[in-house]
Amino acid sequence: MLKNIFNIQTETDFQQKCLETFRYQYENLEVYRKFVDYLNINPSEINEVEKIPFLPIEMFKNHLVLDKNSKAEDYFQSSGTTQMNRSKHYISDFGLYEESIYKSFEQFIGKPEDYIFLGLLPSYSENPHSSLIYMVDFLIEKSGKPENGYFLYNHQELFELLQNLKDKKVILFGVSFALLDFLDFCQSNSQTLKLSNSLTIIETGGMKGRKEEMTKDELLKILQNGFGTEKIYSEYSMTELLSQAYSLGENIYETPNWMRVLVRNTEDPFSYVENGKTGAINIIDLANIHSCSFIATQDLGKILSNFEVPRFGRNDNKQILNNKFQVLGRIDHSDIRGCSLLVV
């Protein structure tokens, strides 16, 4: 049951795997079982995904979210100051996270071995338990290119390297405020970016209080103009997840095959809104088998459409339901985190 989540082939497979995971986590994850029991829900009556209870993400701040059959190797910790009550996600199998990273990247962008990876991720680089840094480190390792590396505030060095790599396939992972700082540096020093179409910029994170907040669309437009590219990609994940959704432009995200977004009603957390309506994001992440695969986040968003996509690695015509969604901001009064956005 714990294996083969990356080989889900049909919508029936996905639904069955979700229900199996729910039953396993109810039986073996103490904090989740107590939550379900508190809601007075009979687990035997959960026979469809929409009925599965989603654990509030805040539980990762004050509880051990790890099943009783697992032993933690280490943990990821959310961004923030040392005075803040930060989330901890205890990890018992880093191989599961690495496979999720690889297959998700491969599905949406390509094989990591084909790219040079550069990281412009200050603040995250200073967090020894950052899941984002672990992800980029893993992609760098798989790439194996000598040009791979991180940049904190050495903008001139990054500028020169980007010019020298114009003929190479390059991925630049950048936290939002750092990408804006880099563009400010180029402008103030009259440095003109001459980049090739082989550069892919993947924006992630947020302003972290370093810049004036703006809408996602405003941010993407500034980055598009500054870097002279038609599309800015984005990555959406969080400390409490082992999977990532990607946007290939226009602030429209897609989930990998073992991950799904549902949008709940902010007035009634046990019901869901229609596609196109704004609500709070619930996330199914089947890679979280040893923690919790059903998480109610404090992010606002909306599902744009449901669609069928072919499974990679298969020659048949079987399809699986997936969704495109937008992330629109944070619920009022929720904690301000490094990945916060202004509601649009």
Enumerate the predicted regions with their spans:
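Active-site glycine/GP-rich loop and adjacent strand/helix microenvironment
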Residues: 2-5, 9-24, 28-31, 114, ...
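Active-site diphosphate/adenylate-binding microenvironment
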Residues: 11, 16, 27-77, 84-90, ...
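Ser/Thr-glycine-rich phosphate-binding loops at phosphate-binding pockets of nucleotides
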Residues: 75-85, 123, 176, 239-241
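"Short basic amphipathic alpha-helical interaction patches in structured regions
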Residues: 79, 88-96, 133-137
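Short acidic, glycine/Ser/Thr-rich loop/turn "cap" segments at secondary-structure junctions
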Residues: 83-91, 113-123, 144-148, 273-274
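Short, conserved acidic/polar surface loops in the N-terminal third of protein domains
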Residues: 86-90, 128-131, 182-185
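Short capping loops/turns at secondary-structure boundaries
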Residues: 90, 94, 98, 121-129, ...
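Conserved AMP-binding loop of ANL adenylate-forming enzymes
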Residues: 108-136
